Amino acid sequence: MLIGYVRVSTNDQNTDLQRNALVCAGCEQIFEDKLSGTRTDRPGLKRALKRLQKGDTLVVWKLDRLGRSMKHLISLVGELRERGINFRSLTDSIDTSSPMGRFFFHVMGALAEMERELIIERTMAGLAAARNKGRIGGRPPKLTKAEWEQAGRLLAQGIPRKQVALIYDVALSTLYKKHPAKRTHIENDDRINQIDR
């Protein structure tokens, strides 16, 4: 059985062209989503996937109607293949029921994986180059090393943490991370009380 799936794009909010192509291709049932592909919750696609059984074929007008990204698309088609369901894209001439269609999809998967690895490699190389130039990624530190040391001295003098946090305009939790409280245990009636110092 051929099951169709249509989804609007951000440019074209009309699915008539897709629907007509799927009807001409022989789809007996067509499921539709009227939302952008970036949304993860697509009830029409979920219903189509539930309806599909072993030996069926999921048909779309174009690849980008099904997947949000190449990685998502390859994952979805892999799940279909595991369930014994074929996939067909009309405008891209992809049909995983044929050996050539399966080969083409494997090549696409390998290219997507290679692209992902290249992005990771370039990112890591860029970060290493920045570190070698003395740049550290992320937000600049709130306080200098000298300011943190001064905050520690104020705490050692007995100034309350809340007051020190206000003076340096830092969160109390940040102050605790930089200068953890010293704990003293006092035994009292078989309980242990902890007192911050």
Swiss-Prot record:
<keyword id="KW-0238">DNA-binding</keyword>
<dbReference type="GO" id="GO:0016787">
    <property type="term" value="F:hydrolase activity"/>
</dbReference>
<dbReference type="InterPro" id="IPR006119">
    <property type="entry name" value="Resolv_N"/>
</dbReference>
<keyword id="KW-0229">DNA integration</keyword>
<dbReference type="InterPro" id="IPR050639">
    <property type="entry name" value="SSR_resolvase"/>
</dbReference>
<dbReference type="InterPro" id="IPR006118">
    <property type="entry name" value="Recombinase_CS"/>
</dbReference>
<feature type="domain" description="Resolvase/invertase-type recombinase catalytic">
    <location>
        <begin position="1"/>
        <end position="134"/>
    </location>
</feature>
<feature type="DNA-binding region" description="H-T-H motif">
    <location>
        <begin position="138"/>
        <end position="181"/>
    </location>
</feature>
<dbReference type="Pfam" id="PF00239">
    <property type="entry name" value="Resolvase"/>
</dbReference>
<keyword id="KW-0230">DNA invertase</keyword>
<comment type="function">
    <text>Performs inversion of a viral segment (G-segment) that encodes two alternate pairs of tail fiber proteins thereby modifying the host specificity of the virus. Binds as a dimer to the viral gix sites which are 34-bp palindromic sequences that flank the invertible G-segment. Catalyzes site-specific recombination in the presence of the host factor Fis. Gin dimers bound to each of the gix sites and host factor Fis bound to the enhancer come together to form the synaptic complex.</text>
</comment>
<keyword id="KW-0233">DNA recombination</keyword>
<dbReference type="InterPro" id="IPR009057">
    <property type="entry name" value="Homeodomain-like_sf"/>
</dbReference>
<dbReference type="InterPro" id="IPR036162">
    <property type="entry name" value="Resolvase-like_N_sf"/>
</dbReference>
<keyword id="KW-0436">Ligase</keyword>
<protein>
    <recommendedName>
        <fullName>Serine recombinase gin</fullName>
        <ecNumber>3.1.22.-</ecNumber>
        <ecNumber>6.5.1.-</ecNumber>
    </recommendedName>
</protein>
<keyword id="KW-1035">Host cytoplasm</keyword>
<comment type="subunit">
    <text>Homodimer. During inversion, two dimers associate to form a homotetramer.</text>
</comment>
<comment type="similarity">
    <text>Belongs to the site-specific recombinase resolvase family.</text>
</comment>
<dbReference type="Pfam" id="PF02796">
    <property type="entry name" value="HTH_7"/>
</dbReference>
<dbReference type="GO" id="GO:0003677">
    <property type="term" value="F:DNA binding"/>
</dbReference>
<keyword id="KW-0378">Hydrolase</keyword>
<keyword id="KW-0426">Late protein</keyword>
<dbReference type="InterPro" id="IPR006120">
    <property type="entry name" value="Resolvase_HTH_dom"/>
</dbReference>
<dbReference type="GO" id="GO:0015074">
    <property type="term" value="P:DNA integration"/>
</dbReference>
<dbReference type="GO" id="GO:0030430">
    <property type="term" value="C:host cell cytoplasm"/>
</dbReference>
<dbReference type="GO" id="GO:0000150">
    <property type="term" value="F:DNA strand exchange activity"/>
</dbReference>
<feature type="active site" description="O-(5'-phospho-DNA)-serine intermediate">
    <location>
        <position position="9"/>
    </location>
</feature>
<dbReference type="GO" id="GO:0016874">
    <property type="term" value="F:ligase activity"/>
</dbReference>
